[in-house]
């Protein structure tokens, strides 16, 4: 059917689709009623369509559940059934036979509405209303019915009284009360009055329409003066109630009247009750503005209906079974009527604010019907729809429409709500009479009232005002003659009403005399003659919008001001405008207050939704009304009826001729009544009132809209629209808020990008993308919103890609900085999904570069926090707490990078509850702040660590600035301190978060402050520090070395004293919880970045006395590895962190000389304190904990390894870069520290147990430390790219990276013989652990080293973990805690993906170790379960870098590796070996070369190594490789998926090549790793080369 197409063309969708949400209601608008040949039911079908689409009636009727049933003749039951079908039936054409039959039976005695006989639609409509009254309130007479639930009387009935007031003598006739359902007006009178009004007014106005109707209804109805003074008085009608639906019946003289076109053009879409009647007593009625929503037309003895569906805001044409969509504007209806020669017979004006009869007022039965009502489309004014929606569930789509309507209706609700009982006619009449008793005064006052109304309408609706002015002659007469003329007009009106109404006994009695004349005429109407002209259709339709169009654009503007009025005005004023000229539209608008118009249009043709209205009906009417009035007044002056310019029917031409007469304007009409001035004042008052009402209406509208939104009321299309609107509105707040949040996050990301923190920017960008995706889902109902969000989403995605590319393309140093930033967020986010983690990783890489020189200091305090999140979940708090101290001692330069790392890391940390993400979020958002704590003095750091330890959750709580200052100072003093810290921390890096944790423990403990600086490097911080300090270290290698050495000594002393004091232990417990997460991520990143550094540190740990190593690596490492400060430690050592700390303290004190030496030589004070903690750990090991550690290492070492692994995963990639930078930074001072520390780290970090299990490690460590230092120095000298003097010690420390190869093999041996398997010298063991994975063939390294790493708890190292490894940077030190995050990091940071995502066991820190192994892609230490080697690490070009950079260092590393491998006790450190080889890849090409597979495996072992030394090596290697390849992605095609196993074993082939590939500069770092000093320098140089 064409109407279907049209209807759906409106965008409503198919009829079924429309109805789908609310079956019948959605269907109703498009449903036709059958009219088979011979049935002649078109009149009934038209009446039914009107009733169904009248929202107010439908809703009210729906609520009626009980009635007086008449059986087969029960019209109520028949209506209910049809309405139900309208609502629920899927049929497009419904039968009306039941109702027709009931109607025929009901009126059988009267022989009306009989089957097969055509009858009058208006009368049918009226009689249906009366029958409804009878069924629901049959006891009450229709004339005095006050039943609150009587729809007919409460919503349709007009309670009127007629009175004649003599203007000369003042005599007043007795009021004649009566009730009418239909207000009949003669079309002839209407046209004549229109002509008169146009003659009197310069411009027609929308407000004139009501006046026109009033004048037409009373025209010729002149009565004799009650006192027989000889005056002829026009009768006056006073409206006593506030009907929400006004039905205007047009009585035609002929079936083929030539006035049809003029009448149509004269019709206004807005009707104000105050204008329609001489006076309105009900305040609601005074304010009420009704909008044309329905019209029954007649043509060729056939009735059809036009109705405005508020839901779709379009006029629909119902011709029995055919339903067509006419258009959104009244003009469209006018056009069709003119073309079809339709004669309007029944006009239905509804109050948009109308409400259904209240349920409480309804009889119990009445409520039954309510559901049917709900089904109605908001065809009627929408009053019912709103009310019904509010009372009941609004129709699915109804709510929105209802809201819209409601807002308009609300304004009218004051008017709309009929008095619960009509004002008693007697009282009203008396009240009215009193004024009218003085005929003149009464008429004057009435005229004033009328003027007020008209003027108000005029101001509100200029076109109507003009119309009113045009009709001013009549108005003037009306003013003075209301009493005289009313009699005739009234009879006509009554006549028409009675003619139609079969049951209008009272009415007929009052107006029966008029019935005969009009009824036959209507029946005989010749619509064809009427619709001969199309010209006026424009005006007629445009009352609301056409009027503005035709009458005046100003009026349109006014309409815009008064959306409601305007929309409705468009429909009505246009027609009026045409017939009336533009005046009618304006007058109509005036009649409708803008708010009313809005409501009407919403519910009707001109309802808010009416598309015809130029202005949104919802626009606030108050201002609009005043403006509109002013404009309308002005326009009225210059307004000429548009219909004049259009070919007109005969009557039209007459009107045009009359209109040619100068328009006097509204005031002209009023001169009769002394109301010109009064009317002006009244006008002002009216305007003010209108403005006030408009405001009130707006408020009501909003409230009602909300209610409607919640309920919905209109059927089919309307409800669809409403539903959509409701959806949008329902989610509008959430949607807007989400979009706003996404925008703010994206802006923050842009800001960070501008600052150079690409990693953090990427993390935020990814967050914005996720938010936008959610927002996009919320915006699904809005095309515009979806488009907007999609656009923003695409922009964000592009930005994220660009950031990734930028990070990958950045020099290793730069990328490490970004990874650092990413790592911090990643570290925080380790618990988060892998993808999230991978972002932080990238951030870390990018941060490292950015943070290399400056942010290290800033990040000094923050890096520990970052490390904590990066390293392990729980250690996070501890990590954070000691972080400041470590920052101070170790991460001065890395502070900046750590700062950024913390920024990104903090984001992740925020996501990690276990990691004290509370702190980390602070750090994440405030990476710089957090990183600042690194610089804190050891005492301050220790205090902070203690405080932080006290509140682990407040990782970021450490004065980042203070830490930053210290870090900055240290950076200023010498990046070597951060480097040394990184080197000293490499074990923390190597261990994933373990080393960091150890450092953090050291920080937590008295040595904690010194360890804390190293903590920043863990995961994110170290890489950052390396990145940041790398250049500086290069520049100030010797100086840094000295500074680091001095700092190491001072830190050693201070930390030793603090450890002795026992503060180490408290810090340690606190530290692990904080660093668990932060270090997990941070250290993983650092492991990647600081692979070299960590290897060096690992070597240093080995070179460090066993006590030192134990204290440093076991205590620091174990505690950091612990989920909590103590928990992590206990997991590692299977010992309370406190006992470990204490034991380590003694042990640390025992080898204090060595640690001090190593710290002095290679590590800053932070390194020294770390050493002390490792020594304490070693002491524990020596005391017999080493075997425990070996046993626990798979379990608890996993925790430590988890830190290491997590960091290697997260940090390794970053560590590769960070280590590169750290090697550079640390080269000066890390040598000694790193030697000793790395020895510790290698032993403790790869596998804490090996270190702890080696009771004789203190002595061996001292020896190995010396050897390793010499080896490292030789290596550093050999690979004097970096030219760091102190790299001799740092190289020794970094050799553990190369040493990782031997350390890997050694670690395996250690695993085999946990206690004594460790080499006598920690360096040997470290080398073994570090190199053994490297030494082991790739396969062996992959299987054994990773297995061991996995055993240690580092699944990420294993190939199986590779997918997890994808996001190694994200991995916490404890992968088990945050296994998914590495995956996240990989996506965010490509580099971390190379390192591989550590596969963390839920509760084992080995997972972290495994992660480390995967990160480094080196063979997993046999003792450690790093089976899941870094698939991504091989992606990371650690190998190439390692191979390239470790040429000179390889020999040293080989030597170290020989030692380590020689030392059977180092075998437990295979975890380190597994982990360190990854760093070795990045940093120890010589090791890999000398160790063969071990070195090739380094990248994998790095990923595999959970142990701190392997983790360190892994960190170095990963840092190098990631800096050059993974992180930078320059050599790597793209980010490696940690969660996906690499295509090939990168440890053997890919990673080495990648390393060679990636770092020319990273090779230096790897070289430095291979050669403790040379390797460190080499790695630093490599980092500088790759990054800078």
Swiss-Prot record:
<feature type="compositionally biased region" description="Polar residues">
    <location>
        <begin position="459"/>
        <end position="471"/>
    </location>
</feature>
<feature type="region of interest" description="Disordered">
    <location>
        <begin position="1093"/>
        <end position="1172"/>
    </location>
</feature>
<feature type="binding site">
    <location>
        <position position="67"/>
    </location>
    <ligand>
        <name>Zn(2+) 1</name>
    </ligand>
</feature>
<keyword id="KW-0479">Metal-binding</keyword>
<keyword id="KW-0488">Methylation</keyword>
<feature type="coiled-coil region">
    <location>
        <begin position="678"/>
        <end position="712"/>
    </location>
</feature>
<feature type="region of interest" description="Disordered">
    <location>
        <begin position="601"/>
        <end position="620"/>
    </location>
</feature>
<feature type="binding site">
    <location>
        <position position="74"/>
    </location>
    <ligand>
        <name>Zn(2+) 1</name>
    </ligand>
</feature>
<keyword id="KW-0833">Ubl conjugation pathway</keyword>
<feature type="compositionally biased region" description="Basic and acidic residues">
    <location>
        <begin position="380"/>
        <end position="391"/>
    </location>
</feature>
<feature type="compositionally biased region" description="Polar residues">
    <location>
        <begin position="878"/>
        <end position="895"/>
    </location>
</feature>
<feature type="binding site">
    <location>
        <position position="150"/>
    </location>
    <ligand>
        <name>Zn(2+) 2</name>
    </ligand>
</feature>
<feature type="active site" description="Nucleophile">
    <location>
        <position position="42"/>
    </location>
</feature>
<feature type="compositionally biased region" description="Polar residues">
    <location>
        <begin position="436"/>
        <end position="445"/>
    </location>
</feature>
<feature type="domain" description="USP">
    <location>
        <begin position="31"/>
        <end position="352"/>
    </location>
</feature>
<feature type="modified residue" description="Phosphoserine">
    <location>
        <position position="574"/>
    </location>
</feature>
<dbReference type="InterPro" id="IPR001394">
    <property type="entry name" value="Peptidase_C19_UCH"/>
</dbReference>
<feature type="compositionally biased region" description="Low complexity">
    <location>
        <begin position="499"/>
        <end position="512"/>
    </location>
</feature>
<feature type="compositionally biased region" description="Basic and acidic residues">
    <location>
        <begin position="424"/>
        <end position="434"/>
    </location>
</feature>
<keyword id="KW-0175">Coiled coil</keyword>
<feature type="active site" description="Proton acceptor">
    <location>
        <position position="302"/>
    </location>
</feature>
<keyword id="KW-0645">Protease</keyword>
<dbReference type="GO" id="GO:0004843">
    <property type="term" value="F:cysteine-type deubiquitinase activity"/>
</dbReference>
<feature type="modified residue" description="Phosphoserine">
    <location>
        <position position="613"/>
    </location>
</feature>
<comment type="similarity">
    <text>Belongs to the peptidase C19 family.</text>
</comment>
<feature type="region of interest" description="Disordered">
    <location>
        <begin position="380"/>
        <end position="447"/>
    </location>
</feature>
<feature type="region of interest" description="Disordered">
    <location>
        <begin position="801"/>
        <end position="839"/>
    </location>
</feature>
<feature type="modified residue" description="Phosphoserine">
    <location>
        <position position="424"/>
    </location>
</feature>
<dbReference type="InterPro" id="IPR028889">
    <property type="entry name" value="USP_dom"/>
</dbReference>
<feature type="binding site">
    <location>
        <position position="69"/>
    </location>
    <ligand>
        <name>Zn(2+) 1</name>
    </ligand>
</feature>
<feature type="binding site">
    <location>
        <position position="77"/>
    </location>
    <ligand>
        <name>Zn(2+) 1</name>
    </ligand>
</feature>
<feature type="compositionally biased region" description="Basic and acidic residues">
    <location>
        <begin position="1536"/>
        <end position="1547"/>
    </location>
</feature>
<feature type="region of interest" description="Disordered">
    <location>
        <begin position="1525"/>
        <end position="1562"/>
    </location>
</feature>
<feature type="binding site">
    <location>
        <position position="133"/>
    </location>
    <ligand>
        <name>Zn(2+) 2</name>
    </ligand>
</feature>
<dbReference type="GO" id="GO:0006508">
    <property type="term" value="P:proteolysis"/>
</dbReference>
<feature type="compositionally biased region" description="Low complexity">
    <location>
        <begin position="601"/>
        <end position="616"/>
    </location>
</feature>
<feature type="binding site">
    <location>
        <position position="145"/>
    </location>
    <ligand>
        <name>Zn(2+) 2</name>
    </ligand>
</feature>
<keyword id="KW-0862">Zinc</keyword>
<dbReference type="InterPro" id="IPR052398">
    <property type="entry name" value="Inactive_ubiquitin_hydrolase"/>
</dbReference>
<keyword id="KW-0788">Thiol protease</keyword>
<protein>
    <recommendedName>
        <fullName>Ubiquitin carboxyl-terminal hydrolase 54</fullName>
        <ecNumber>3.4.19.12</ecNumber>
    </recommendedName>
</protein>
<dbReference type="Pfam" id="PF00443">
    <property type="entry name" value="UCH"/>
</dbReference>
